[in-house]
């Protein structure tokens, strides 16, 4: 039995959960952001330069005019993830986003994996957007900057950029300084650039509807076949099919529309930066859900309007994949409008750069404050900004932008983002079926305390009765469980959620790599597909039968467990689509992260220090279990160092 002790202790270390106390929700960074600031941040980071490029690329190669439907499908898939983030923003209004949510619900190891991948995603995002900003500005100057550096600073090494991008470094360091100065000033800059970007997009939409032609959505297949014969010199062949699809609204069929939706899904990535502002926004329980939902709605309307205007102005098969809007304006005789588009593109890149850089130091700060990364990164400035985390993140991003060719690394961003989306949806499923949720901390009042105490007593009493009645697991208790959640029903849901993730992985792999066998109606593939689909549906229905926690928060995901389950399915399916090279690079980054975690983080974890007082250095501290109220108040020695630095009366000062 002795050898089992260290192993069990080690496992407890990996699954210990963050215990958020009410005091930690009060002592925070400078709360100076409004709901409008969050909406502008979400719109700015999500509605980046892709809106000026992506619509033309997808419409020409995948969707045609039905790109508007592709954006609608992508928006619905993104909203499912956004709603899960919104509920957690209402439940846990602290800095950390998906990292913190995973720490509270699933445990420390998964939290570190999530945070470590988000760091890589934001670093690559910041560096690539900075280089894109530099490249766009260089285009406006006739490529004089790139010509100069290629002549005098050319780098001929594999994996490195063609030339060092000094301008991108300047942009990142300038933005790092702005963020270090204070979040309030950064929010003002972001609102200005976001407003200009939206005005430019409104100009594009109105122009497109004025100069557009509905006939561009009704091009005949015969006309496209004639074009194909001319383009490919197929005049001597019979039964020629069009290389531009079959015409009409969906020239590439519904499969093309779905393929376009998969690409358009990434256009909505970025709203999760709102979830990192939990300690810097006033009334976060309401502001974060509103900010996420409204920003996604605004972005969908912008993508929908621009793609509709673009495909109305110009036939989809003539669209330019790199500069669709300037070419479309030239096509309708409004050539000078390209300068307006250029201004909007630079503003969009500016807000996108801020949207990538803003959450990066906050994830680093949250992990360092919890002891999983080096403690010096948790230091805050007198203006209550994560100073050292911001500067460190800025320097690393600047080095990446200065030296490396980031095109090969951009796909790794998708893994970090999709993994975070999947885990947040998983956490929502797990938490809603737990017997007690005590980390949502309303403002104190004697009346609320008395009411809450009476509710807890009644809930605990009934829960205890149910636990006695359900002491043995059976099919009857699975289908007809108690009216209130118990430890047994919570464990049942946890097992089903794990099974759900396994089924989704199998279903995604089969539909990705076994498409040929399914199309040929191979018996084994059809049987396996049917088994996975039926098991997936039955698992969701069994989860739905379990009792949910009755505690209400400002925002809760509707249609549980169906929406989070569909979100997990969409996200994992998109992860499976990524190339093997991307997963190899991801594995290398994770290996580096595990070295840091198992040599430093697991020993310096703040939750591990809290456990020391119980005589078990790695005892599991669930963020969901109720604690004795006296213990929660009388624990000054366990207070976080950063929280001590931020006195209560200073939290409102910026």
Swiss-Prot record:
Keywords: Amino-acid transport, Cell membrane, Glycoprotein, Membrane, Transmembrane, Transmembrane helix, Transport
Reaction catalysed by this enzyme: L-arginine(in) = L-arginine(out); L-lysine(in) = L-lysine(out); L-ornithine(in) = L-ornithine(out); L-homoarginine(in) = L-homoarginine(out)
Tissue specificity annotation: Expressed in liver, pectoralis and gastrocnemius.
Biased composition (Acidic residues): 631-640
Residue stretches spanning the membrane: 38-58, 66-86, 104-124, 163-183, 192-212, 249-269, 290-310, 340-360, 386-406, 410-430, 490-510, 523-543, 555-575, 582-602
Composition-biased stretches (Basic and acidic residues): 641-654
Topological domains, Extracellular: 59-65, 125-162, 213-248, 311-339, 407-409, 511-522, 576-581
Protein name per Swiss-Prot or TrEMBL: Cationic amino acid transporter 2
Organism: Gallus gallus (Chicken)
